[in-house]
Amino acid sequence: MLNEFKEFIARGNVMDLAVGVIIGAAFTKIVTSVVDDLVMPIVGAITGGGFDFSNYFLPLSANVTAPTLAAARQQGAVFAYGSFITVLINFMILAWIIFLLVKAVNRIRASVEREKAPEPAAPPPEDVRLLSEIRDILKQRA
């Protein structure tokens, strides 16, 4: 069973997947930084500085009178839709950035493939060429 496990791990697909997961984890940090540190401040400046909806909520009981979500949750049940809106906006920005990166990578790959000129087909060996000529002559006689 140990040998089977070694063979499974040594296959290229498993190693490629492991590398992809590790790079994906590192890439997530980069994209999160782009969203939090570059995109969100610009959006906040355009919208007047307030782009954090995390304190938007609806109280579900009369006991809830707190102005912040954390305090309101301590007082009773709340419908915290603001956090969801913030996460949804962050996700949309993240998805857009990833889309743009994938599109750029695909464009680069396509240009690299276009630069590679297809190699001309090698001429057939002499015996194949002679057999083709014989075949063509026999077709003409028939």
UniProtKB/Swiss-Prot annotation:
SUPFAM superfamilies assigned: Gated mechanosensitive channel
Gene3D superfamilies for the chain: Large-conductance mechanosensitive channel, MscL, domain 1
Key words of the record: Cell inner membrane, Cell membrane, Ion channel, Ion transport, Membrane, Transmembrane, Transmembrane helix, Transport
Residue ranges of the TM segments: 14-34, 38-58, 82-102
One GO cellular component, as annotated: plasma membrane
Topology in the lipid bilayer: Multi-pass membrane protein
Entry-linked Pfam families: MscL
UniProt keyword annotation of Signal present: no
InterPro entries: Mechanosensitive_channel_CS (IPR019823), MS_channel (IPR001185), MSC/AndL (IPR037673), MscL_channel (IPR036019)
Domain of life: Bacteria
The keyword Transmembrane appears for this protein: yes
Subcellular location per the Swiss-Prot or TrEMBL entry: Cell inner membrane
Family: Belongs to the MscL family.
HAMAP family attached to this UniProt entry: MscL (MF_00115)
Protein name, as recorded: Large-conductance mechanosensitive channel
Organism: Sinorhizobium fredii (strain NBRC 101917 / NGR234)
Species lineage: Bacteria, Pseudomonadati, Pseudomonadota, Alphaproteobacteria, Hyphomicrobiales
